[in-house]
Amino acid sequence: MAVEMFYDDDADLSIIQGRKVAVIGYGSQGHAHSLSLRDSGVDVRIGLKEGSKSRAKAEEQGLTVGTPAEVSEWADVIMVLAPDTAQASIFTNDIEPNLKDGDALFFGHGLNIHFDLIKAPEFVTVGMVAPKGPGHLVRRQFVDGKGVPALIAIDQDPKGEGQALALSYAKGIGGTRAGVIKTTFKEETETDLFGEQAVLCGGTEELVKTGFEVMVEAGYAPEMAYFEVLHELKLIVDLMYEGGIARMNYSVSDTAEFGGYLSGPRVIDAGTKERMKAILADIQSGEFTRRLVANVENGNTELEGLRKANAEHPIEVTGKKLRDLMSWVDRPITETA
């Protein structure tokens, strides 16, 4: 089914310019949204808890900062860009008591709405504007007069103005310059979670670690294994990002292409596909979200345990040593402190 696309001419910037926008959170997306909206002539305030390290940064960039409750009371459009696991609490304690008839509640990701962790009053417009790129790219493209494609969705529309408002907001951050795709909270949430778990984060990570283990257990040097299964992954991903799988296969050697065709299906086979379907089913049923919420309620104990085990994998030790040799690699703070 063809998606519905919107561009600059389909959006009226004056709609969002006539509203007061509170952006809850000042991370990667919050920073990009708020600065770009401000530069588009929108009245913006940032909602951050007392003591947040981001307060000084936002104020240095000329933005007005208040608590989430204060800016929610002031605003008539509230964009929630805090971490997924913090949103329900912020909504209950700070946003919901300050909602008024005619307000709009927007999100950058649909998880909390789709799985009913947040239930907005019926008089509130509920929508989503989600750029398909990290915040620094959204901001850089906006400043350069370009844009990053974005998604919009409307879950609740008591006044029939949700889509026009979402498009106006998307235009304010540069999304309509590139193109905006209309979707649903269900589709955005489930596809996003599946991509993260089965391919981008979970699947890729386990493929890399297992490849490393196979090579080291076969007697190859850990350094050689690291280069072949992790370091060179960026070269392949960049080619796919720029021109798809066909561009990647065109760009690598015939040996690599031929070997990939023969061996790829031996690694990712019909059984893998069935397990991926099971992962999707867990997402669709809400099972993953229930486990996510339980982890938060238990003090993140499951997540911290998984993080610790992952950090102790031998590929991390080898990788840190090799990255010391790579002056061109941006080192994370945890490795340079």
Swiss-Prot record:
Substrate binds at residue 253. GO terms for cellular component: cytosol. Mg(2+) 2 binds at residues 192, 228, 232. Keywords: Amino-acid biosynthesis, Branched-chain amino acid biosynthesis, Magnesium, Metal-binding, NADP, Oxidoreductase. Residues 184-329 form the KARI C-terminal knotted domain. Pfam families: KARI_C, KARI_N. This is Ketol-acid reductoisomerase (NADP(+)). It comes from Rhodococcus jostii (strain RHA1). The gene is ilvC.
